[in-house]
Regions:
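Start-of-helix register in tetratricopeptide repeats
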Residues: 5, 39, 73-74
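Conserved structural position within tetratricopeptide repeats
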Residues: 29-32, 62-66
């Protein structure tokens, strides 16, 4: 498993377990490795929304849509 895959897996696990701050950290690290991945931007947005950081979450969803306008998960 690559470093990126490990970060994504850990982020998803923490998100599912309700550890939103940890999930956010993993997704931010993953985005440093792959900044043009719309799914990562969407996952970061979900973590931010779960933390009540709605404006930042909206920015992430918009970034995801800029990268892939067909990405319905971020709308």
């Amino acid at each position: 498993m690559t470093e990126l895959e490990t970060l994504i897996q850990n982020g998803a696990k923490n998100l599912q377990e309700g550890n939103f701050g940890n999930a956010l950290s993993f997704f931010e690290q993953a985005l440093l490795l792959k900044p043009d991945d719309p799914d990562l931007w969407n996952q970061k947005g979900i973590a931010l929304r779960s933390l009540g950081r709605y404006d930042e979450a909206s920015e992430c969803y918009n970034r995801s849509l800029q990268l892939d306008p067909r990405d319905r998960a971020s709308s």
